[in-house]
Swiss-Prot record:
Superkingdom, natural source: Bacteria
Full protein name: Imidazole glycerol phosphate synthase subunit HisH
Organism of origin: Bordetella parapertussis (strain 12822 / ATCC BAA-587 / NCTC 13253)
Keyword Cytoplasm: yes
Glutamine amidotransferase type-1 domain mapped to chain residues: 3-225
Length: 225
C-alpha cells in the first residue's frame, strides 16, 4: 500500500485534499503530516497551500518541515497544489518573498486591469478597445480551461481543454519553458501546471474539480517517475 503524506505546515486545505485523495485512491494510506520524519517515511508527498505567500513561507520555515519538503522534492513523487505549486519557484512578487527555489522562475501578480480574450503582441493594433472587452476580476476564481502543452502521465484519461477550479491572484512564471505542461487564459496566458522529473504541480485545485480533479490525484498515486 502506498503511503501519501499531505504536508501540514498550517497554511492549507489539508483535510479537503485528504478527502479527495481517499476518494480517488481508497487503496492508499493517506496521512496529514506535521513532522519531518512522517514526510521522510512516506512514498509520495502532496504539498498544498493557500493564503499569502509571506505567511506560507514563514510558517513552513517555522514548522521545521522545509527541509523535509526539499528532501521529498529531490527523491520521491511530489505534487504541489495552488500556493504549494508557487512555493516551488525562486521568489514571489507577493511581499518580495524568497521561496524554495526548486524550479527557476518567479511568481507574479495578475496585472490589472485584466480583460477577456488575451491578445498577442503582434495583434494589439487590431484588437478592440479595452472598454469593449469583458473586464476580469482578480482574484481569478472559478472554473477555467486548461490546455495541455505536453503529454504527461498525470494527464492520462483527462481530455485536453478540461476545466478545473481556480482561486488565486498570483501565478508561476517559469524561467524554463520546458517546465510548463498546462496553460490557462485569464487576461494573460499563464502557466497553470509544471512538471520535471519526480515533481508535478498545479495552480488549480484538483480537490474542487470534480471527476477530473480526482482522476489527477489517482494518476499521481499510480505515477512511477
Amino acid at each position: 500500500m502506498s503511503t501519501i503524506a499531505i504536508v501540514d505546515y498550517g497554511m492549507g486545505n489539508f483535510h479537503s485534499v485528504a478527502r479527495a485523495l481517499q476518494h480517488a485512491a481508497p487503496d492508499a494510506d493517506i496521512r496529514i503530516c506535521n513532522r519531518p520524519e512522517q514526510i521522510d517515511a512516506a512514498d509520495r508527498v502532496v504539498f498544498p497551500g493557500q493564503g499569502a505567500m509571506p505567511d506560507c513561507m514563514r510558517t513552513l520555515n517555522e514548522s521545521g518541515l522545509r527541509a523535509a519538503v526539499e528532501r521529498a522534492a529531490a527523491s520521491k513523487p511530489l505534487m504541489g497544489v495552488c500556493v504549494g505549486e508557487q512555493m516551488l519557484f525562486e521568489r514571489s512578487e507577493e511581499g518580495d518573498t524568497p521561496c524554495l527555489g526548486i524550479f527557476p522562475g518567479e511568481v507574479r501578480r495578475f496585472a490589472g486591469p485584466q480583460f477577456a480574450d488575451p491578445v498577442a503582441a503582434d495583434q494589439a493594433a487590431a484588437a478592440p478597445p479595452a472598454a469593449a472587452r469583458e473586464r476580469l476580476k482578480v482574484p481569478h476564481m472559478g472554473w477555467n480551461q486548461v490546455r495541455q502543452t505536453r503529454s504527461h502521465a498525470l494527464w492520462e484519461g483527462i481530455p485536453d481543454g478540461t476545466h478545473f477550479y481556480f482561486v488565486h491572484s498570483y501565478y508561476a512564471a517559469p524561467s524554463d519553458p520546458a517546465l510548463t505542461t498546462g496553460v490557462t487564459d485569464y487576461g494573460v496566458a499563464f502557466t497553470c501546471a509544471v512538471a520535471a522529473a519526480n515533481i508535478f504541480a498545479v495552480q488549480f485545485h484538483p480537490e474542487k474539480s470534480a471527476e477530473h480533479g480526482l482522476r489527477l490525484y489517482r494518476n499521481f498515486v499510480d505515477w512511477q517517475p
